[in-house]
Amino acid sequence: MKFIDEALIRVEAGDGGNGCVSFRREKYIPKGGPDGGDGGDGGDVYLIADENLNTLIDYRFEKRYAAGRGENGRSAGCTGHRGNDITLRVPVGTRAIDNDTKEVIGDLTQHGMKMLVAKGGYHGLGNTRFKSSVNRAPRQKTNGTAGEKRDLLLELMLLADVGMLGLPNAGKSTFIRSVSAAKPKVADYPFTTLVPSLGVARVGSDRSFVVADIPGLIEGAAEGAGLGIRFLKHLERCRVLIHLVDIMPIDESDPVQNITVIESELYQYSEKLADKPTWLVFNKIDTIGEEIAAEQAKNIAEQIGWQGDYYLISAATGQNVQQLTRDIMDFIEANPRQIIEENKALDEVKFKWDDYHQQAMQHPVEEDWSDFDDEWSEEDEEGVEIIYERG
């Protein structure tokens, strides 16, 4: 199935039903009083994370999703039925953004997480609500409010422990093939990897971590060169980044310059991502021999001012790969995933009708009663009098 990690959809919550103005009119019950019911609330729109999905492709074809409208109130104090909610299933790791305001509504990072993205309109109030000691026959009501409508940008961000960085042909896909059962395409030309892929690396019988491979970056990616930087978002939730460097590029490019290019593009995309723990790994040491590779790696590290440790591996032959995966596993276990409070602002996400409950009673709609007789007679026919709102 084609990997789609972005989709723009229209979500429309249901409108609230209008309140009803009616009076109880029964024989032998003079002036029975108001009995207009409230309308029903409009339906809401939710997103729910489903671990069985891995792409947003369904939302590329169907763009509009609307919840049900609340029913109008009726006589005899009958409240209108609430509009039907709709729930849209998305892959785990999906972020919802209001495309107009760019407000991040929330992230769905666990299976079964549910999030409100469009709130239904508040129900209108029937005339029963306006009865008081000084207004025994109220002719006021309120109409239901319109449901929220949003242009919603869905972004799928892969959930992985380890993210792979590097130029095209650095050997990222070969590394994933060597440490996991994933089989990304491998070839001797740039941009073999066109979409992100995940692999599960097992260390021993009971330990494992998830590694994400993204298409390689090139100089100018921040301005759209190559495949651009759109896939870097998939590394935002990784705990550690592996910067894989071809120690002796076949195109005779300078590894020092190659490292600088990646760091620059990463920084231009996100300072937060650039500050993540990053390990330097020199690949393809089998092409020049271990001793020459060690000397070359030392010179490169000195030129870029690298202060930490670095690794020399051959993803193709598996040389030193096992030690690297063990060290990665130890790091991950020593640094458990933190529940980043990126969604702290979610508590402050203000939906359109949050204050309507308090304001509705202050602005009622009054019916035009010029055509109706205020005098109630006990001789009237038995039944309920319903006053319908004029078009």
UniProtKB/Swiss-Prot annotation:
Alphabetic keyword roster: Cytoplasm, GTP-binding, Hydrolase, Magnesium, Metal-binding, Nucleotide-binding
At which positions is Mg(2+) bound? 173, 193
Report the locations given in the UniProt record: Cytoplasm
InterPro entries xref list: G_OBG, GTP-bd, GTP-bd_Obg/CgtA, GTP1-OBG_CS, GTP1_OBG_dom, GTP1_OBG_dom_sf, OBG_GTPase, P-loop_NTPase
For this UniProt entry, the molecular function terms from Gene Ontology, in alphabetical order, are: GTP binding; GTPase activity; magnesium ion binding
Enzyme class name: hydrolase
Please give the cofactor(s) recorded in the UniProt entry for this protein. Mg(2+)
Pfam families from the entry?
GTP1_OBG, MMR_HSR1
Q: Which GO terms describe its biological process?
A: ribosome biogenesis
- The record places domain Obg at 1-159
Kindly state one GO CC term assigned in the UniProt record: cytoplasm
**EC number(s) given by UniProt:** 3.6.5.-
Q: Which domain of life is it from?
A: Bacteria
Coiled-coil residue spans:
none
Gene3D superfamilies reported for this sequence: GTP1/OBG domain, P-loop containing nucleotide triphosphate hydrolases
Protein residues bound to GTP: 166-173, 191-195, 213-216, 283-286, 314-316
Residue span(s) of domain OBG-type G: 160-333
Q: What PANTHER family is this protein classified in?
A: DEVELOPMENTALLY REGULATED GTP-BINDING PROTEIN-RELATED, MITOCHONDRIAL RIBOSOME-ASSOCIATED GTPASE 2
Quaternary structure, from the entry: Monomer.
| Function according to Swiss-Prot or TrEMBL | An essential GTPase which binds GTP, GDP and possibly (p)ppGpp with moderate affinity, with high nucleotide exchange rates and a fairly low GTP hydrolysis rate. Plays a role in control of the cell cycle, stress response, ribosome biogenesis and in those bacteria that undergo differentiation, in morphogenesis control.
* Family classification: Belongs to the TRAFAC class OBG-HflX-like GTPase superfamily. OBG GTPase family.
Q: What is this protein called?
A: GTPase Obg
Q: From which organism does this entry originate? A: Haemophilus ducreyi (strain 35000HP / ATCC 700724)
Q: What is the lineage of its organism?
A: Bacteria, Pseudomonadati, Pseudomonadota, Gammaproteobacteria, Pasteurellales
UniProt gene name? obg
